[in-house]
Amino acid sequence: MEVVSKIDQENQAKIWKQIFGFAESLVLKCAVQLEIAETLHNNVKPMSLSELASKLPAQPVNEDRLYRILHFLVHMKLFNKDATTQKYSLAPPAKYLLKGWEKSMVPSILSVTDKDFTAPWNHLGDGLTGNCNAFEKALGKGIRVYMRENPEKDQLFNEGMACDTRLFASALVNECKSIFSDGINTLAGVGRGTGTAVKAISKAFPDIKCTIHDLPEVTSKNSKIPRDVFKSVPSADAIFMKSILHEWNDEECIQILKRCKEAIPKGGKVIIADVVIDMDSTHPYSKSRLAMDLAMMLHTGGKERTEEDWKKLIDAAGFASCKITKLSALQSVIEAYPH
């Protein structure tokens, strides 16, 4: 039998790691559902296995199973285990597993890992031969109909989006002040969700009059102004859209951008908050951005775009120029200027 070389061993290990890649997402979800981070945080001091087991909300707890879950979480570097005392504590990333603060990532974790929202991934390859709608194949209907018929899932999705937007908005208002200080008196936010980003902009720049114009499928619940962006966009010095264009194909995006161009005055601009895929695969967000691209392909038929893709799209919509600013967030800011 052939001896396994060191290189072969390393390559096999990489494949095994990818085979069980799903485990990290689901163990992370389990940690959130069990409130492990909350329990350790509330206790202040590190906790032994038995102490932690006795304080978790779910009771009674099987300590052996909890130990094995914690072992995996420690391996993920989300929690620490002291080699001497055998007690557990929070590692720095675990603060994002705590509920109830503005940078908590719990809603995003629960949304992205939801069993219905992950179901289309099982049909990833189906779309290569024909025009398969993976979401519809997995759940029996397209995503927009599904959301209307399943309000609890729609709420879960919107909470995840709002969570993502809070993280983005913090970076936006702190790192991109110049975007909002060049003659913008009015700003219209157009999108699907809770208006989290526009509210943050309004709070950070109170001199700008901000309005929220939501897509029809969510207006009824959020008491905002309904707007079909394919037909018209509200007039303002700046149009703001976050995570909207990635839901649509290039032709549909060009239509939306043309409506935006018609709505802004000379000296105005369109501010787009969306993923810009990295050509540098070493960027901390590069893998997440590529995964987002696949998620959009599966869920809506949309896509994430590279810097070059964005420039071509904006040029095709008739804009004169654009500027892309990278932030310390999953999304970047793309400013499109009509003149």
Curated annotation (Swiss-Prot):
S-adenosyl-L-methionine binds at residues 161, 165, 191, 214, 228-229, 242. Substrate binds at residues 164, 243-247. Highly expressed in capsules. Expressed is stems. Expressed at low levels in roots. One of its GO terms (biological process) is methylation. Pathway: Alkaloid biosynthesis. It is an enzyme of class 2 (transferase). Methyltransferase involved in the biosynthesis of the benzylisoquinoline alkaloid noscapine. Catalyzes the conversion of (S)-scoulerine to (S)-tetrahydrocolumbamine. Homodimer. Forms heterodimer with SOMT2. The heterodimer SOMT2-SOMT3 possesses 3-O-acetyl-4'-O-demethylpapaveroxine 4'-O-methyltransferase activity, where SOMT2 is the catalytic subunit. This is Scoulerine-9-O-methyltransferase 3.
